Swiss-Prot record:
Family, as annotated: Belongs to the KdsA family.
Lineage: Bacteria, Pseudomonadati, Campylobacterota, Epsilonproteobacteria, Campylobacterales
EC number of this enzyme: 2.5.1.55
Pathway where it operates: Carbohydrate biosynthesis; 3-deoxy-D-manno-octulosonate biosynthesis; 3-deoxy-D-manno-octulosonate from D-ribulose 5-phosphate: step 2/3; Bacterial outer membrane biogenesis; lipopolysaccharide biosynthesis
Classification via Gene3D superfamilies: Aldolase class I (3.20.20.70)
Places the protein is found: Cytoplasm
TM region positions: none
Designated name of the protein: 2-dehydro-3-deoxyphosphooctonate aldolase
An example Gene Ontology biological process: keto-3-deoxy-D-manno-octulosonic acid biosynthetic process
Keyword entries, A-Z: Cytoplasm, Lipopolysaccharide biosynthesis, Transferase
Source species of the chain: Helicobacter pylori (strain HPAG1)
KW Metal-binding (keyword) present: no
Amino acid sequence: MKTSKTKPPKSVLIAGPCVIESLENLRSIAIKLQPLANNERLDFYFKASFDKANRTSLESYRGPGLEKGLEMLQIIKEEFGYKILTDVHESYQASVAAKVADILQIPAFLCRQTDLIVEVSQTNAIINIKKGQFMNPKDMQYSVLKALKTRDSSIQSPTYETALKNGVWLCERGSSFGYGNLVVDMRSLTIMREFAPVIFDATHSVQMPGGANGKSSGDSSFAPILARAAAAVGIDGLFAETHVDPKNALSDGANMLKPDELERLVTDMLKIQNLF
């Protein structure tokens, strides 16, 4: 395995709430993230979902929807100067979301959906493909190649450098470990960095899917531990969901970090990356 990469000079940081709750809530989080966004060592993206289409229960809050959600993300982009990440679940959403978002994310459950990957790849946005909890990390090269060949039909095999050049990233978010639990195999980070830049999702990796009577639970106290380990193994950036009041968040509150907790985590991550 190769251990050195021609990687970007800055570490990527993708941070924000799980789902858009309101414009006021987005602003309250965006303000708290300004110190991180202004850190010269970070390439910062503000994230939030306009629709959580894969919630466990029909009764769970999903978000404001495509049109209203993108309007609010555009306001955050203009007011704070932040670059934006949001996820898309259906092919028709890609071209519309790309008018606002700098990164379009493919959810983990949809990481093999060819039509969705192709449609997102036809936009100018960076693509962040989350590794499915059920996926062999080696097999994520085929999802990467779908995106790369859509953007450049001459590409025959995925490499880290080619994926970096064409804006195709992968995101590790844990693997299924029996029912209702996830575990992170740190080997996945090195395996996937053979053919794409890799972002580590620290907060979804501590999720316990379906563990709370119709919704997911988790333990955010483990997120900093896993993130520090991932930084030591070697990653291109960190994904972490954050909220000013995680206990009352409308989605994934058990996994999210408060902004000050995230800031301490990122400080640790950068120190670890300095060692390599």
